[in-house]
UniProtKB/Swiss-Prot annotation:
This is Ribosomal RNA small subunit methyltransferase G. One of its GO terms (cellular component) is cytosol. It is found in: Cytoplasm. S-adenosyl-L-methionine binds at G85, L90, A138, E139, R151. Specifically methylates the N7 position of guanine in position 527 of 16S rRNA.
C-alpha cells in the first residue's frame, strides 16, 4: 500500500440549513428543492426501515447532503458513478440531484437489499433522477463507470473486493470513511496491493475521503 497520510488543514464548513448548503455548492433553487424533498422522503421512510441513524436526521444538510456533495469537488468532470451499498441514497441520490440535467449523467445505485431498493425507486420516481437501480451485489455487475464510491458500506478490506471489478474497467474509487480509516487501510494492505490518497472531509473533522488506484489482490479475504 502506498498512502498519503500527511495531516492537512481542513476548512470547517457547516451548512446547517438549505441556504447555507446552497452557498457552499452553488446549487440551483430547483436542486435545493429536490434535496429538501429527499430530506422529507428519507425521514418518512426511516420510520419503517433502518436507513440512517435517527439522531443524524436533524443535521441532514451537513451530515448527509454536504457529506455526499463534496465528492463532486474531487471529480467535477465525472458523469457516470456507481454508489455501492446505496441503500439510503447517500451519496448517490445527492449526486444524482446535483447532476440532473447534465448531459451524459448517470448514477448507478447498487443495493442488494430489496426493501432498500424500493425506497430508492420511490425517491428516483418522485424526483425524476438520472439513476439506474440495481438490486444486486456490487461484484456481480458488469458496469463501466468513471467513479465508484461508497459510504457506510463495509470495512475497507471488503469494500475493495466489491470495487475491484469497477477499477479493472477503468474507474477511480473515492470512498467516504470515518476516523478509523488508518486501521482499515492497514488491514486491507494485508490482502490487497493498492495506492491510496487521503483527503480530509469537509463535513466532518474526523472523516477522510480515500482515493484508491492500482488495486491488485495479494491473498483471498
Amino acid at each position: 500500500m502506498s498512502a498519503n497520510l500527511a495531516p492537512q488543514i481542513v476548512e470547517q464548513l457547516d451548512p446547517v440549513d438549505g441556504p447555507a448548503f446552497q452557498r457552499l455548492t452553488g446549487c440551483t433553487d430547483a436542486q435545493l428543492a429536490d434535496l429538501t424533498r429527499f430530506q422529507a422522503l428519507l425521514t418518512e421512510w426511516n420510520e419503517v426501515m433502518n436507513l440512517v441513524g435517527p439522531a443524524t436526521l436533524p443535521t441532514y444538510w451537513n451530515r448527509h447532503a454536504w457529506d455526499s456533495a463534496q465528492l463532486l469537488k474531487l471529480a467535477p468532470d465525472a458523469r457516470t458513478w456507481a454508489d455501492l451499498g446505496a441503500g439510503a441514497g447517500l451519496p448517490g441520490v445527492v449526486l444524482a440531484i446535483l447532476l440532473k440535467g447534465t448531459p451524459g449523467a448517470k448514477i448507478h445505485l447498487v443495493e442488494s437489499m430489496t426493501k432498500r431498493c424500493k425506497f430508492l425507486r420511490a425517491v428516483a420516481d418522485a424526483l425524476d433522477l438520472p439513476v439506474e437501480i440495481h438490486n444486486a451485489r456490487a461484484e456481480e455487475l458488469d458496469l463501466k463507470v468513471e467513479i465508484v464510491t461508497a459510504r457506510a458500506c463495509a470495512p475497507m478490506v471488503r469494500l475493495l473486493g466489491y470495487a475491484q471489478p469497477y477499477l479493472k474497467r477503468g474507474a477511480t474509487a473515492w470512498f467516504l470513511k470515518g476516523q478509523d480509516v488508518a486501521s482499515e487501510l492497514a488491514e486491507a494492505a494485508t490482502y490487497w496491493k493498492f495506492e491510496s490518497d487521503l483527503r480530509p472531509s469537509l463535513s466532518d473533522p474526523r472523516g477522510q475521503i480515500v482515493q484508491v488506484k492500482g488495486l491488485k489482490s495479494v491473498r483471498k479475504v
